[in-house]
C-alpha cells in the first residue's frame, strides 16, 4: 500500500524527523488559509498522487503570492496528472499539499528497502538527490552507498556515520542531525512494517540544517492487519479499480497490457501460464491467482473482474486441483458465464482433484467453453481464438 506525501510527512513528524511546514487542502479557499498558517510570502504547491515525476508533469509549482496560490490549486484539483510512472489516463488529484519554501544548498538521497537476497533492511544514500534514483543506479551505481542492517542488533549509529562521511559531509552538527534522521527512519521502517522508504531529496539548507523535502512510503500489505492507523490512510482512488475489487474477494490480481485474461490457482502456475501465452504468440491481460481455497463465489467474482477489462478478447482458465476441487471451479465458471454473459472465447484446462467431474460439468452445461487437452494446448487454443477475433 502506498501513502501520499502529506501522509508520509505526518508519520515523519511523529518520529521527530524534520520536514517543512505544510498543510494539506481540498479546495482553493483552504489553500489561502493554509498559507497564512504556514507564514511567508512564497509557497510550493504539490499535487498529491501515487506517482513520481510530478515536477516535470506540472504537479509541483512555486507560487509567489496568494493569488497565484489560489489559481495553482484551482488548476490542479480535480484533474488527472500524467507522469512517466502513470498510464495515459494519469492519477486523480484530490488533495494539494501547500508547503513553505526551503533554501536549498545541496540535495541528497536517502532510502531504505528490504533486500530479498540478504533478507535484511538496507539503507541507501547518494549525493545525487532530487533525481530518479533508478537512473543513478543504472548509470552511476558507484554513487549509491549502502549499509545492511543486522536484525539481531538493529541499525547502529556508526553505520549512519559511514553513510554521512561517504556522502562527503564533514560538519559535526550535521552528522548528529543526519544520525538522528536515519535512526528515526529505521524505527519508522520497522515499527510500521514498511517495504520502501525514500527521502528524495534530503536537503541541506543555506543555514546548514537537514530537512526531508519529499517522502515516499510503501507499506507491506500483509502487515496491514496490525497497522490500523495506516490502513485508514489507504486512498483507493489512486489504485486500479480492478485490483481494488479483487482485494475485497482476497484475489491476487495485477492488470497487464495484453488481451488474454487469465484465471489460475497458484502464483507459480499463474506466472508459467503467462509465459506460455507469450511463447504461443499472445499477450496476457492480467495476473490472477484465485488461491488454494477458491469457492464458487470467488471464481464468479474473478470472472467479473477479468471481463470488466475492455481489452480482454479471450479468457484462459488453468486449474491444477490439489486443495481446490476442479468441479467447484467448473461450477464457478458456469455461474459466471450465466451471470455475466461472457461473449469472448473461454478455454479451460483442468487437472487433478475431481478434474473429470469438472470437465463433465462444463461439457454438460451446453455453453461454448473450449476444453484444452493440456497446458500447452490451452495456451495455443486461446491465442488462436483471440487471433480469429482480431
From Swiss-Prot:
Binds 1 Mg(2+) ion per subunit. Keywords: ATP-binding, Ligase, Magnesium, Metal-binding, Nucleotide-binding, Tricarboxylic acid cycle. Its cofactor is Mg(2+). GO terms for cellular component: cytosol; succinate-CoA ligase complex. Residues 9-245 form the ATP-grasp domain. Its EC number is 6.2.1.5. Pathway: Carbohydrate metabolism; tricarboxylic acid cycle; succinate from succinyl-CoA (ligase route): step 1/1. It catalyses: succinate + ATP + CoA = succinyl-CoA + ADP + phosphate; GTP + succinate + CoA = succinyl-CoA + GDP + phosphate. The keyword Glycoprotein does not apply. The keyword Nucleotidyltransferase does not apply. One of its GO terms (molecular function) is succinate-CoA ligase (GDP-forming) activity. ATP binds at residues 46, 53-55, 99, 102, 107. Substrate binds at residues 265, 322-324. Mg(2+) binds at residues 200, 214. GO terms for biological process: succinyl-CoA metabolic process; tricarboxylic acid cycle. Heterotetramer of two alpha and two beta subunits. Succinyl-CoA synthetase functions in the citric acid cycle (TCA), coupling the hydrolysis of succinyl-CoA to the synthesis of either ATP or GTP and thus represents the only step of substrate-level phosphorylation in the TCA. The beta subunit provides nucleotide specificity of the enzyme and binds the substrate succinate, while the binding sites for coenzyme A and phosphate are found in the alpha subunit. Belongs to the succinate/malate CoA ligase beta subunit family. This is Succinate--CoA ligase [ADP-forming] subunit beta. The gene is sucC.
Amino acid at each position: 500500500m502506498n501513502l501520499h506525501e502529506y501522509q508520509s510527512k505526518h508519520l515523519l513528524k511523529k518520529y521527530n524527523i524534520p520536514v517543512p511546514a505544510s498543510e494539506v487542502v481540498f479546495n482553493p479557499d483552504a489553500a489561502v488559509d493554509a498559507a497564512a498558517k504556514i507564514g511567508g510570502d512564497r509557497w510550493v504547491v504539490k499535487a498529491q498522487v501515487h506517482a513520481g515525476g510530478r515536477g516535470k508533469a506540472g504537479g509541483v509549482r512555486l507560487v509567489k503570492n496568494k493569488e497565484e496560490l489560489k489559481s495553482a490549486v484551482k488548476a490542479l484539483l480535480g484533474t488527472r496528472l500524467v507522469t512517466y510512472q502513470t498510464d495515459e489516463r494519469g492519477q486523480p488529484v484530490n488533495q494539494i499539499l501547500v508547503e513553505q519554501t526551503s533554501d536549498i544548498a545541496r540535495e541528497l538521497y536517502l532510502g531504505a528497502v528490504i533486500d530479498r537476497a540478504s533478507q535484511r533492511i538496507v539503507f541507501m544514500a547518494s549525493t545525487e538527490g532530487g533525481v530518479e534514483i533508478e537512473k543513478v543506479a543504472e548509470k552511476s551505481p558507484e554513487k549509491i552507498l549502502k549499509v545492511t542492517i543486522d536484525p539481531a542488533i538493529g541499525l547502529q549509529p556508526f553505520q549512519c556515520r559511514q553513510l554521512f562521511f561517504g556522502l562527503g559531509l564533514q560538519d559535526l552538527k550535521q552528522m548528529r542531525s543526519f544520525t538522528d534522521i536515519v535512526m528515526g527512519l529505521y524505527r519508522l521502517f520497522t515499527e510500521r512494517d514498511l517495504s520502501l522508504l525514500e527521502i528524495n531529496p534530503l536537503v541541506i539548507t543555506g543555514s546548514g540544517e537537514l530537512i526531508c523535502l519529499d517522502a515516499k512510503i510503501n507499506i507491506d500489505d500483509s502487515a496491514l492487519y496490525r497497522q490500523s492507523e495506516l490502513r485508514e490512510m489507504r486512498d483507493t482512488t489512486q489504485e486500479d479499480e480492478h485490483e481494488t475489487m479483487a482485494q475485497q474477494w482476497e484475489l491476487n490480481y495485477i492488470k497487464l497490457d495484453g488481451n488474454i485474461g487469465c484465471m489460475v490457482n497458484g502464483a507459480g502456475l499463474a506466472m508459467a501460464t503467462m509465459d506460455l501465452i507469450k511463447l504461443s504468440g499472445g499477450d496476457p491481460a492480467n495476473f490472477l491467482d484465485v488461491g488454494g481455497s477458491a469457492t464458487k463465489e470467488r471464481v464468479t467474482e474473478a470472472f467479473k473482474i477479468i471481463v470488466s477489462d475492455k481489452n480482454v478478447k479471450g479468457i484462459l482458465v488453468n486449474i491444477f486441483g490439489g486443495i481446490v476441487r476442479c468441479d467447484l471451479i467448473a461450477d464457478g465458471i458456469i455461474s459466471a458465464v450465466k451471470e455475466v454473459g461472457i461473449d469472448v472465447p473461454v478455454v479451460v484446462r483442468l487437472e487433478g482433484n475431481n478434474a473429470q467431474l469438472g470437465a463433465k460439468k462444463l461439457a454438460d452445461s451446453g455453453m461454448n467453453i473450449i476444453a484444452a487437452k493440456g497446458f500447452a494446448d490451452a495456451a495455443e487454443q486461446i491465442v488462436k481464438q483471440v487471433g480469429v477475433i482480431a
